Amino acid sequence: MRTLVLLRGCPGTGKSTWIRDHHLNQYTLSADQLRLIHQSPVLNLEGKYDISQKNDGKVWKLLFSLLEERMERGEFTIIDATHAKQSMISGYKALVLKYRYRAYVVDFSDIPLETALLRNRERAEHKQVPDSVVHAMHERILSEPAPSWTTVIKPEEFDDVMQYKPRRLDSYKKIHVIGDVHGCFTVLDSYLKGRLEDDELYIFTGDMLDRGIENAKVVQFLLSIKDRKNVILLEGNHDKYLKQYGHDEETRSSVFNKKTKPELDEAGFDKKDIRELARRFHQIVYFTYGEDTYIITHGGISALPDNLLFMATSQLINGVGGYETDIDHVFTKNMEGRNIIQIHGHRNMFRLPVHAAAKSYNLEGQVEHGGHLRVVTIDRSGIQTYEIKNNVFKTSAPPLTSHHEHEELTVEHFLKHLEEHDYVSEQKLAGGISS
């Protein structure tokens, strides 16, 4: 999930050993390891080998490039470096804001200087640094606090802080979990009866926009409820376009660009309001209610891992496995014997009912195509399922896989089908060629 952890401490404080002992190597980017990838140890004037610093420009450029790739996917990531200067930590702020991460600094400064000096001398020859460097970094770390936009923790606090725990939601009379809306406001308003109850919680599983024909009304509704404490918006794969729209960024979606965006433009929304709305989307809802534990994501997952923080946000949004995966039965099989219930949207290729498997509820009901808005409610009496028929949608030509008697498929028809397809985007090449 979207969590960045920066280790901070002078050489010899045990940062790399701590990573190894906590089995966190697979989540870690190490500046020293990248230095050794660029160049093997070099002989210094004392006749010993050490790690060259001459490639640091390339090293940090590569590290930030790899980090941004991870952050695009919402991966939990640790950076193993000294981070002695406050300015070094500040260098991550732009990415933290761009990808909506939480940033933590694990502070190793409680390790006594004498201990760090001793450990430094005991390290492999090429990993040792001069005592003067250890002294200077130690003093700088003590005199320059980490920036206020980070949360500072001690190494011994890590296991407790970095554990995504369920919250208790028993204070609510009822919990409504509402499936993919896809720009269909009328059917949503029909279910809500025009209002939200203050003592009830409303969780939206994502994909609020696209495909439907009432996108502007949906956005207006979201703007009206986004600050309510009893509303949780989950991020779906289509909802990233809302963030891009608010920041005037390029959106690589023909459906959004040709259908949704014109609706939003005509409505004249303030882009600042759109940006604030985009920041309200959550990655996951994990809670207990009564005797049961619930995990709600947009895409659906295969099991509840030991620590949800280690899951990439991209998997929470797009789901584990492919679109064709029957994730409901996969989850039920993997979670046999555990009192955990999954609720998700996004995919339902097999047209499963809302209660798709013993431990999994599927809220994808093709609402945008005249199907149903799917809802699950949870209260003291248990779980109830609902399907509300959507009668406000755009009728489109039959899919190309259908058989049309006396109808010939033309090039124009095929190209139009590709242009309107949700999962096909055009890439323009030189010479007027499109791919």
Report residues per predicted region.
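Conserved phosphate-donor/acceptor-positioning beta-strand/loop module used by diverse small-molecule
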Residues: 99-116
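Glycine-rich phosphate-binding loop used to anchor ATP phosphates in small-molecule kinases
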Residues: 54-104
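Active-site neighborhood of divalent metal-dependent phosphoester bond hydrolases
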Residues: 125, 211-294, 302-303, 307-330
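N-terminal active-site segment of His-dependent metallophosphoesterases
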Residues: 155-221
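Acidic, His/Gly-rich catalytic cores of divalent-metal-dependent hydrolytic chemistry
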Residues: 329-432
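Conserved GTP-binding G-domain of TRAFAC-class P-loop NTPases and closely related GTPase folds
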Residues: 4, 111-163
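Conserved substrate/cofactor phosphate-moiety recognition/catalytic segment
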Residues: 16-75
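Glycine-rich phosphate-binding P-loop
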Residues: 3-21
